[in-house]
């Protein structure tokens, strides 16, 4: 005899805080690797899931090899996943595999790293994804990427690869440094670059554009002029967006050349739990 049960639905789901943060190769604006500083920013923001860009893992400094990603996760009591894009020689005696990372208060599973399309003259970029397997974000897949810094045409090619990869998934969100200036006000809505127009056409909502507080500029951290760090959700799941803001403060100014973006989100009312 076969039995079945109705899908569980989410009612008054607890919110989760999602963060995207380019950590500038572990080097603050003062060129120091300061894990206490980074940990305090993430902890004070109450972040549950964090997408990191420009992560070296492991990193060799002055002949010694360190694993700051693992140590940062340990300090925050978080799990982590890393997806390399290539190799970086940041400076004399400072080098290692570089890419994106995820930190999560909840278990992560099925982490995958996808190398994105590129032009012959451009650096390799990647997309890291992992399923969140516990807590109020269970059933959500987190993706983090870092697009080319030089040319919108290259970024457009890369985001097409991102969209193709994410199309295989159910509920998910995408964060990262897109190196593409975002919507900053009513008069710029029609001037969105092709990358952001393509995401909108594919049915993705820019979280800050929907529920953002304050100016939202993320770069450069000491005197931000543009918003190039984003969180996107498919429109179906974007109904759960509650707030978005770029962090500020003296510690944030020194910790990286970017400001982190923090978004609060909950499962939309009545959505069924993924199997």
Indicate residue ranges for each PLM-predicted region.
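Active-site beta-strand/loop signature of hydrolases that rely on acidic residues for catalysis
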Residues: 17-23, 38-64, 103, 130, ...
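Soluble or luminal CAZymes and related metallo-dependent hydrolases
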Residues: 30-37, 64, 68, 122-124, ...
């Amino acid at each position: 005899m076969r039995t079945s049960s109705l899908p569980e639905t989410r009612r008054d789901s607890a919110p989760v805080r999602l963060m995207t943060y380019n950590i500038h190769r572990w080097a603050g604006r003062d060129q120091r690797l300061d894990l206490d500083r980074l940990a305090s920013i993430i902890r004070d923001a109450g972040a549950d899931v964090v997408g990191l860009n420009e992560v070296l893992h492991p990193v060799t400094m002055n002949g010694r090899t360190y694993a700051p990603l693992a140590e940062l996760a340990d300090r925050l009591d978080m799990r982590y996943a890393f997806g390399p894009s290539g190799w970086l020689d940041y400076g004399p005696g400072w080098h290692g595999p570089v890419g994106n990372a995820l930190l999560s208060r909840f278990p992560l599973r099925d982490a995958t790293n996808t190398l994105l399309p590129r032009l012959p003259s451009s650096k390799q970029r990647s997309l890291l994804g992992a399923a969140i397997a516990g807590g109020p974000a269970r059933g959500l897949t987190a993706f983090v990427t870092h697009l080319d810094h030089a040319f919108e045409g290259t970024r457009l090619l890369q985001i097409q690869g991102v969209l193709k990869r994410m199309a295989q998934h159910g509920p998910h969100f995408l964060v990262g440094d897109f190196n593409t200036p975002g919507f900053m006000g009513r008069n710029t809505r029609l001037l969105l670059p092709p990358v952001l127009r393509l995401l909108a056409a594919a049915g993705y909502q820019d979280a800050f554009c929907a529920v953002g507080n304050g100016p939202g500029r993320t770069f450069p951290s000491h005197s931000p002029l543009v918003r190039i760090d984003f969180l996107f959700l498919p429109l179906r799941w974007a109904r759960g967006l509650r707030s978005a803001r770029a962090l500020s403060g003296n510690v944030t100014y020194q910790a990286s050349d970017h400001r982190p973006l923090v978004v609060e989100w909950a499962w939309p009312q009545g959505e069924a739990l993924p199997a």
